């Protein structure tokens, strides 16, 4: 099957090309922290020769509790994103939750993300697609990999063929997630070769059934990421934090920023090895 390539300047995103790291922090906590985190990612990825896109949210609109930190909001968030681009020359991915956000966000960032909980909201999907920006679709935890083809079709029907698909885990009973490793290739197939990436951080969430925030399994981030990279993917989606225990969102799943270089080095080694193999057709 022919694999599609999406180009962002000098970055090529495709299942059969070197993986792209979509990395940053869960939510913009401050301008200074965003600068610190982005600088570290840029240093590490440049040293290792890994293509890089910065990620963060300006508004976590789906927090469990009304009292939880959501972010600085769109206006302030876009200012921070623009400063990161001007300072480090990075490409940026962020999510939108409302139709009115689509166009102004697409004018600043390079990839706009369709959140998993909103992935079947047709009006939002259409508004995002019509910006002409690259769209990253998070697979809903409740949706099978095979159903992702319908979301891709919605976007393409609006005249936008720049679609990335992202797996962030699948419901496993109540308050738990698992990753279906066979699902990555299903998504490649039903999307006719769209780039598929793996959000390892959010796949590690494990909720307290009566709590107001997600727990996580940070100690397993490297092992789960290794397994995903062995499939042969277009990219890895990762959140890191200088002090995960003090993060304002999803700290229990975040990689300590100090471990970033060792982590990315291992992912690159696996990606290089897997993509050096010749494909073996076992379908007949």
From Swiss-Prot:
HAMAP family with a match to the protein in the record: KDO8P_synth
PANTHER family, per the entry: PHOSPHO-2-DEHYDRO-3-DEOXYHEPTONATE ALDOLASE
One GO biological process term: keto-3-deoxy-D-manno-octulosonic acid biosynthetic process
SUPFAM superfamilies: Aldolase
Pathway(s) served: Carbohydrate biosynthesis; 3-deoxy-D-manno-octulosonate biosynthesis; 3-deoxy-D-manno-octulosonate from D-ribulose 5-phosphate: step 2/3; Bacterial outer membrane biogenesis; lipopolysaccharide biosynthesis
NCBIfam families, sorted: KDO8P_synth, PRK05198.1, PRK12457.1
UniProt-listed Gene3D superfamilies: Aldolase class I
A Gene Ontology cellular-component term: cytoplasm
Domain of life the protein comes from: Bacteria
Protein family membership: Belongs to the KdsA family.
Localisation per UniProt entry: Cytoplasm
Protein name: 2-dehydro-3-deoxyphosphooctonate aldolase
Gene field: kdsA
The enzyme's E.C. designation: 2.5.1.55
GO molecular function: 3-deoxy-8-phosphooctulonate synthase activity
Keywords: Cytoplasm, Lipopolysaccharide biosynthesis, Transferase
Catalytic activity, as annotated: D-arabinose 5-phosphate + phosphoenolpyruvate + H2O = 3-deoxy-alpha-D-manno-2-octulosonate-8-phosphate + phosphate
């Amino acid at each position: 099957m022919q694999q599609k390539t999406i180009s962002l300047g000098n970055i090529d995103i495709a299942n059969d090309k070197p993986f792209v790291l979509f990395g940053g922090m869960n939510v913009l906590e401050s301008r200074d922290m965003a600068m610190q985190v982005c600088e570290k990612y840029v240093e590490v990825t440049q040293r290792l020769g890994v293509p890089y896109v910065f990620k963060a949210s300006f508004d976590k609109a789906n927090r469990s509790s009304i009292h939880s930190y959501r972010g600085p909001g769109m206006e302030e968030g876009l200012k921070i994103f623009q400063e990161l681009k001007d300072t480090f020359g990075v490409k940026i991915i962020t999510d939108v939750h409302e139709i009115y956000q689509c166009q102004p966000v697409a004018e600043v960032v390079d990839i706009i993300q369709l959140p998993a909980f909103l992935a079947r909201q047709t009006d939002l999907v259409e508004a995002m697609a019509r910006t002409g920006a690259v769209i990253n679709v998070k697979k809903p935890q409740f949706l099978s990999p095979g159903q992702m083809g319908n979301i891709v079709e919605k976007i393409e029907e609006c005249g936008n063929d720049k679609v990335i698909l992202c797996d962030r885990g699948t419901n496993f009973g109540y308050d738990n997630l698992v990753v279906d490793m066979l699902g990555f290739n299903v998504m490649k197939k039903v999307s006719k070769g769209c780039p598929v990436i793996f959000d390892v951080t959010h796949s590690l969430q494990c909720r307290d059934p009566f709590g107001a925030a997600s727990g996580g399994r940070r100690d397993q981030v490297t092992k789960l990421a290794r397994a995903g990279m062995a499939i042969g993917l277009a990219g890895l989606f990762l959140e890191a934090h200088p002090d995960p225990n003090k993060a304002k969102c999803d700290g229990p799943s975040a990689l300590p920023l100090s471990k970033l270089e060792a982590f990315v080095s291992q992912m690159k080694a696996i990606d290089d090895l897997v993509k050096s193999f010749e494909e073996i057709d076992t379908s007949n």
